[in-house]
């Protein structure tokens, strides 16, 4: 299959370029805010709409700073230590979900500490929202022709312009489907059908567990980052970073259902 050559830049005004990647962040945050408000309206949890509105600034800073620093420190430290100014070039791409997640968690902790809010009550509201951003972000990765999969002989293998012109798994679409659509559906079903907000930490545990499982599995089809390659002969950085998420998620699920 031929890659649909879509310009990563939607439009430019002088030096200002609006990319699909940056737009995915903006739309993801807006849709997430809207969806979280709907959850609050229906279930009336400890978290209020005013709390959510106040948290947005914390979340944006935590996600962007954490995502960027995560990529810099975990995926390409030599380049950025040699050229520190490149750290600011976020328009070139280069964000780590695991770094963004950690940044968001730290931001949530600081926010909850300041406003004396239960930490897991906040993350349980945020958990069902995150797959929206994951879906849009992976679609943007696909449009950019980055983070593509390993070489395949399958009929749906796709030739990406930035690769070696060999057919590859469109792993960005696999991630958009499982980490985005499927995970969103699981959490929506849990939240609205099984009223999981009544059990503190359960939504957060479901998110971490299923994200970890999906990411570890899909990494089998994704090409390792060229500057890192395989770790311990067969593991990728994404798989290694997802194991703690899987363990944390399992713990949160267990502690939310004490015997």
UniProtKB/Swiss-Prot annotation:
Signal peptide limits: none
GO MF term list: phosphatidylglycerol-prolipoprotein diacylglyceryl transferase activity
Pathway: Protein modification; lipoprotein biosynthesis (diacylglyceryl transfer)
Membrane-protein topology: Multi-pass membrane protein
InterPro entries in UniProt: Lgt (IPR001640)
Binding site for a 1,2-diacyl-sn-glycero-3-phospho-(1'-sn-glycerol): 138
Protein's cellular compartments: Cell inner membrane
Catalytic class of the enzyme: transferase
Keywords: Cell inner membrane, Cell membrane, Membrane, Transferase, Transmembrane, Transmembrane helix
Gene Ontology cellular-component annotations: plasma membrane
Pfam families xref list: LGT
Residues that span the membrane, as ranges: 16-36, 55-75, 92-112, 117-137, 172-192, 201-221, 228-248
Enzyme Commission code: 2.5.1.145
BP GO terms, sorted: lipoprotein biosynthetic process
Family, as annotated: Belongs to the Lgt family.
Record's function text: Catalyzes the transfer of the diacylglyceryl group from phosphatidylglycerol to the sulfhydryl group of the N-terminal cysteine of a prolipoprotein, the first step in the formation of mature lipoproteins.
Descriptive protein name: Phosphatidylglycerol--prolipoprotein diacylglyceryl transferase
Native species: Rickettsia rickettsii (strain Sheila Smith)
Gene name in the database record: lgt
